[in-house]
Amino acid sequence: MSFSGEMSNGKTDVTNGGFSSSPEDMSGAEEGKENSSGIEVEASDVSLSLTADETGTTQAESRDSCSETSGEDKDSDSMDDTGHYSINDENRGNDQSHSEDEEEEEEEDEEEEAVRHRKRAQRKRANRDQESSDEERALDDWLISEKTPLPPPQWRALSALRQRQMGSSTRFIYEACGARGFVQRFHLLHGLDGHSGCVNTLHFNQRGTCLASGSDDLKVVVWDWVRRKPVLEFESGHKSNVFQAKFLPNSGDSTLAMCARDGQVRVAELSATHCCKNTKRVAQHKGASHKLALEPDSPCTFLSAGEDAVVFTIDLRQDRPASRLVVTKEKESKVGLYTIYVNPANTYQFAVGGRDQFVRIYDQRKINENVNNGVLKKFCPHHLVTSEAKANITCLVYSHDGSELLASYNDEDIYLFNSSHSDGAEYIKRYKGHRNNATVKGVNFYGPRSEFVVSGSDCGHIFLWEKSSCQIVQFMDGDKGGVVNCLEPHPHLPVLATSGLDYDVKIWLPTAKEPTELDGLKEVIKKNKRERDEDSLHHTDLFDNHMLWFLMHHLRQRGQRRRRRDAGLGAGDAESDDSPSSSDSSDDDEDGPDRVQCIPS
């Protein structure tokens, strides 16, 4: 084999990248060159003497051998390189297998976590279902208890009529008014139409011949409720919703006290000729004033309460009638008030309720705001004392003899307290089934001895409970607009007047042929309970969730009235919007939400 062939093959191998240029290879080549030069010459001579065929064959073999050599070198080098890369490949393979194992472990962990999550969700769902089923079962049990037979009535109509005929009973009407049989036969007699807004207040005079009503339309109407005719109608002088209008006792029906959303307390002087002489402001709260409290026998003095937490005592005999009696506080914070009532058995004492869960009783002779903020004693259902949901009292009222105190809580139930119990005492009765959320809902006793509890509801129904058994004995559809707010019993007869979002007053008498069957009561109670539970999950503050509803309701009604008015007026009549009679409406537009019925400021 010639050296030149090796060199040429060496070039080829260098080009192909298979030639070894390490120092060991180079030194071996030089040593071979020095020791065998003769052999190479001899070999070259021999190669020159060969024939052309042999030369071609030899060249071919030489090429083959060189190619084999280069192939061996290439294989040797490639083996060296392969050995280097094979370690990396093994490492990469190990890394890959390790990462695959980790991925498998992660997938297994994720699957296990997903399984655990599904199990937790199933347990939670099962717990929720169990809780809802328990609540449903408890509600069904309560409804079943509501349908259990009531004890026999103490008053029976036939025997009472027979005794009256014989002259042996002088208390027939008194006992009949408190009879369950009459309450279960309540039926709508008629409506009194005369307002153009929601009716927020009702009050019978002492004799029961007249009924006063006040409305969002800022008017007060005095009705002959039997003949369905207004005896007197006048502007109240208030700038916003009239919340209460009451005849002062022993005044000959000549004095009517009023309060409203504008915070004013006003007095109207009525004449015997069925006209209003004038109205004057006697007190001014810094917030809305929802309720007045009359003293049973006084034609000159009464109390007012406002959302500014102030209670005024008003004496019409004074040049400056109003004087501040107390500011209601819990620790150092003022508590806005929605309701106030004087104890009929002890007129020095009065109770208030408002923007917290406590019924507070004060004694006008013992108010010292430095001692317990002047409070004589407080009542609250014990489960509401530490409740996260913010409870509010929308209305409270004393019983006929002052021994009991009834309080209605916002989005809660109605509770009865014994007013003679000590400070912090628990309630003695609880009345359930209605819904008190959308407005400042009223509550009242019915019957000459406060035998029943009556309340409106957001579902538009009127509920009457028997006080002693807490069972619902009457259930009536009382308002098409959806909310019943006011309930006023007649002072002497089995008559009930109610009002709400509708623009009329409804008169109820026991004229039904058969006692009520309470049809649909179960479904209504379940719906009220479900809505109350849903609202309690995102409860914020009193009526925040319902303010928008009432604003939209009011704006829709205002738009409908405006469209009807515009449709009936010509172009010339349209200019009458600037007349003095429309100045109140412009003020109302500025007030905006102030014309929303029965919503706190």
From Swiss-Prot:
Keywords: Coiled coil, Cytoplasm, Nucleus, Repeat, WD repeat. GO terms for cellular component: Cul4-RING E3 ubiquitin ligase complex; cytoplasm; nucleus. It is found in: Nucleus; Cytoplasm. SMART domains: WD40. Residues 1-150, 561-601 are annotated as: Disordered. Belongs to the WD repeat DCAF8 family. This is DDB1- and CUL4-associated factor 8. It comes from Xenopus laevis.
